[in-house]
Structures are given as C-alpha cells and as structure tokens.
Amino acid sequence: MLYSNTGLYFLIDGTDRTLTATMNDDFLDLWTEDVFEVFLWTDERSPVYFEYEISPLNRELAILVPNFGGQFLGWRPWHYEGGRATRKATSVIGGPKQAHASIQGWRAEFFIPYTLLRPLQNVPPKEGARWRANFYRMDYDGGQRTQWEWARVGESFHEYLKFGELQFAGR
C-alpha cells in the first residue's frame, strides 16, 4: 500500500488453484466468491468505515458502512464516476481469466481516490495520522471457503474495533 496527495494505491497478490468467480457486474455480493477486501476506518470517533472488494474478473464493490452495535448496511457511492471512481486492474497467473479455470494465482491493483472516501473524517490523512484498517482474502477452492485477514477479527470481517492500525509517514 502507498499513498499520495490524491489517494491510496494497493497491490494484492495471492496464490490460488481455481478461479472461483462468476459475477460479471459490479456492486454484487462479491464476497461469496474469490475476492480481496480492504476496510478503511479513518476516524475512530464514528462507527462508519469504507469497504472495497475486487474479484479476479475485475468486478468491484465500493461501499460506505455505518456499523452501529453490529447492525450494518453498505451504502453505494453517489456519482461514482470520473475523479470519484477507483482505477483498477486484475491479472491471473498460470491460466485463463475465466470462471472455474485452473490457475496458480491472481493479483489486483487499484487506486482509491480520497474524493471517494468523503464524507469520512480525517481524509486525506496528514503526516502522522492513524487510520484503522483490515485486509482480507476469500478463496473458495473445492467448494470450501478459506479466508485470510491481516488483523485477526472474529466471526465477522465487520468487527471494526479489532482492525489493525495504519500510520501515515512523511515523504
């Protein structure tokens, strides 16, 4: 992960045996198939965070999540275009980029502009700022779900109080 004056840059890479991804539209329930996920909680004073998911087929889900006492629902961005839209690309290693293909892995690179993160507070981050965050991978090889997480949470990825911490260093 890198950051600039305009947004955040991510590159996520994972090994995989089978490309379990069939959804061909954005803003679907991508987490039910192979996916990388990023959660950004920019201000601990408010239980609202940003969630971004990307599938091997380059489909995405970008939502703002208010989470009050474990009750949460994602809100889609309004005017998700131009400078507010992410820039993204995915690639597959060792096989074709198609549903159920045998592969060796896949990677995603994407840019999340700060304009998309508004109205969250503490955006853009200043030098020394701290955000809470988590990074996840869902994999469904052999019909079974396997998941990885950067900061251990629990039953739900939405246990934001257990997210890890990012500190933004100077340039």
What is the role of each PLM region?
Residues 1-171:
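Structural preference for beta-rich elements and adjacent junctions enriched in aromatics
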